[in-house]
Amino acid sequence: MKHLLIASGFAIALASSAFGQSAAEKTGVNSLIGVAPKTEDFVTEAAASDMFEIASSKLALERADNATKTFAQQMVTDHQRTSEELKALVSGGKVKATLPTDMSKSQHSMLDKLQKLNGDDFVKQYHADQEEAHEMAVDLFKRYGDEGDNADLKAWAAKTRPALEHHLQMAKALNK
């Protein structure tokens, strides 16, 4: 079964290379088989991840308990910084990619769900979302930092990953 899944992943990855945007990255196949995303896909996903982290954490600053607010403030500060760093790489011409203007549909759905919650329900969902978002971000940054095709972006991803790993550990601790 595992071999069939991996073979299917390779087939999707190969087929998707003929199209502009990577279906393999969108569907998670690249993550499953450990393949680095294309530069454009990495920029899109990293920027959208920052947007989600900032928006959801600003909401947590309004609705959460003190421990969660402390975490949320760090997320806002850190992700605003990484967002600016990524923008500088792209606008400075070191990375040939287009920054997205909005987060993904799934991130919008997660944020919409959070906006409908209050109290303990909000806190539990925010903690779970943060853990999931940081697991995905760590994986994305690891894959690009290890095997990305743009040297400047690859170095930035590798430099940024330890902070994301720390965020993940913090999110896991909050989620207990």
Where do the language-model regions lie?
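His/Met- and acidic-residue-enriched segments that coordinate or traffic transition-metal cofactors
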Residues: 2-9, 16-176
